[in-house]
Amino acid sequence: MPTCPSCNAEVPAGIRWCGICHGNLIDRNIGRLASPGKRLGASILDWVIPFVALLLIMLVGGLFSGLGAAAGGEQAGGAIGLFLGFALLIAYIVWAFKLFARGTTPGKKLLGMRVVKEGGQPAGFGTMLVREWIGKVISGMVFSLGFLWILFDRDRQGWHDKLVSTYVVE
């Protein structure tokens, strides 16, 4: 029976990831499968970051609107606040899309994870768009079973991962 090159555990033939150390059996440089807890942390960050950005947009807009009203030009202050808030939103979107092109999300990047295809190459922009925007909708449709699937799947794949043949690695 073959053994894992990282932990020397016996592994069945034909599988890609070690069930003990979660290392890649074909190419050790790809990394290990990310834990479900770490993936949950990244998902939370992927929601918290835009929420904080939205709060900042509202704060900046309100601040400039208030300053404009105090100076007698309420519309000018509101317009400046709206412009700055919009600029912040665009900056976040550009940052997120650049990370998508590298096969990661803001939360995964901050926690040191990335999304790879079966051969270990980065998932890429198109794959990430389908995975994040279509696959995650599917994963969440039936009581979030597609996300919970990660806990029981040997390769720690959710339905959104299976849809585009991706793995989340550290």
Indicate residue ranges for each PLM-predicted region:
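Membrane-interfacial and juxtamembrane segments of integral membrane proteins
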Residues: 2-170
